[in-house]
Amino acid sequence: MYCTHLKTLQLVVMATLWVTPVRAGTDCRYGCRLNNMTITVEREDCHGSITITTCAGLCETTDLNYQSTWLPRSQGVCNFKEWSYEKVYLEGCPSGVEPFFIPVAKSCDCIKCKTDNTDCDRKSMATPSCIVNPLEM
């Protein structure tokens, strides 16, 4: 009788531990999701700040310790799944000024990094020289 209860308890614990990481990934605080961001917009006749909806967060990715010709390297990045352009007028602009058209995210997803419009290198080539690896200091 004791062994039966122990086996049942082991099965319940194993099932709970198996489901927990699955739920943690979807409820993760830093996962890929919609995020409000304030940006500064300028043009000759006016300037100001606007708040847009964009995508931000972490995506699960793997990085092999060795280069392989059989296994393609890919990195997951948080990017727009669905988006549209929205017309934005800045406060303080003279009347008759053309509006800004800003891409606004409607939904986000972790997708394979597309090298045609995203810097997918491990260390960006555009990294400012003042940023150094603390291990190299």
Swiss-Prot record:
It comes from the Eukaryota. Its main location: secreted. GO terms for cellular component: cytoplasm; extracellular space. Pfam families: Cys_knot (PF00007). InterPro entries: Cystine-knot_cytokine (IPR029034), Glyco_hormone_CN (IPR006208), Gonadotropin_bsu (IPR001545), Gonadotropin_bsu_CS (IPR018245). Residues 1-24 form the signal peptide. Heterodimer of an alpha and a beta chain. This is Gonadotropin subunit beta-1. The lineage of its organism: Eukaryota, Metazoa, Chordata, Craniata, Vertebrata.
